[in-house]
């Protein structure tokens, strides 16, 4: 059973920026399930998409792999000779725990977990690349360069799966979806104090884009097709195919 997320349950005098440290890594499975609507559906479908798009003797990347939920889902579904999965995260606490979880299960598909900045990773001969709630934590100026690097490293016909929180240019829509998301968190046991303090901690480090910005960027980079395949409130997932 996952350790309960109580990080923001008591009043904090000075709230610093949210970081993926040891405290977060310890409660991350509980935090993510109670904070992101549809997370389990996204993880399951990432495995299904990987099964469809992973090719023999290619690489599959999970960039910002955290504790490896997407990596494990893909490994369960991939059955291609010579296909390897590479998970990357810059949090030593996440990487340490992720390796333990990965090594707890045997599989014919090899997995390597690397501690590194995803902006520095060389993407090569990829059939599938996953950015599962990761791009939104990069400074906006670095996002296009990473996506261009991914595009260059993807095989023709390869797929990028990008899950993100979205903002909406229509203020009424944006506020409604934010309110619904907060209702979702309340229904999952978070208090008003926890919701408020978490929002204060994360608002300067997670800067979401509108869906149209994602689509336009995909098109400009050269992806031939892209679409939202899942959305719940202001969270969702897209694919882009080279």
Swiss-Prot record:
Chain positions recorded as S-adenosyl-L-methionine binding sites: 39, 64-66, 89-90, 117-118, 132, 199
Keyword Nucleotidyltransferase: no
GO biological process: tRNA wobble uridine modification
UniProt entry keywords in alphabetical sequence: S-adenosyl-L-methionine, Transferase
Signal peptide extent: none
Reaction catalysis annotation: prephenate + S-adenosyl-L-methionine = carboxy-S-adenosyl-L-methionine + 3-phenylpyruvate + H2O
Biological function: Catalyzes the conversion of S-adenosyl-L-methionine (SAM) to carboxy-S-adenosyl-L-methionine (Cx-SAM).
Stated name of the protein: Carboxy-S-adenosyl-L-methionine synthase
């Amino acid at each position: 059973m996952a350790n309960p997320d109580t990080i923001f349950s008591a009043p904090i005098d000075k709230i610093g920026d949210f970081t993926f440290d040891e405290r977060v890594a310890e409660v991350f499975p509980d935090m993510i399930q109670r904070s992101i609507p549809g997370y389990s559906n996204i993880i399951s479908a990432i495995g299904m998409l990987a099964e469809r798009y992973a090719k023999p003797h290619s690489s599959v990347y999970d960039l910002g792999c955290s504790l490896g939920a997407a990596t494990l889902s893909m490994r369960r579904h991939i059955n291609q000779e010579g296909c390897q999965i590479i998970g990357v995260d810059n949090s030593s606490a996440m990487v340490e725990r992720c390796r333990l979880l990965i090594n707890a299960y045997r599989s014919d598909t090899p997995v390597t977990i690397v501690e590194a900045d995803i902006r520095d990773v060389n993407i090569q001969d990829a059939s599938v690349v996953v950015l599962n709630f990761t791009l939104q934590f990069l400074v906006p100026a670095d996002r296009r360069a990473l996506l261009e690097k991914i595009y260059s490293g993807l095989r023709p016909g390869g797929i990028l799966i990008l899950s993100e929180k979205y903002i909406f240019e229509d203020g009424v829509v944006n506020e409604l979806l934010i309110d619904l998301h907060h209702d979702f968190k309340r229904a999952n046991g978070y208090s008003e104090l926890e919701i408020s303090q978490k929002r204060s901690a994360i608002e300067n480090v997670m800067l979401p884009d509108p869906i149209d910005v994602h689509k336009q960027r995909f098109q400009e980079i050269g992806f031939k097709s892209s679409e939202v395949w899942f959305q719940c409130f202001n969270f969702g997932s897209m694919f882009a195919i080279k």
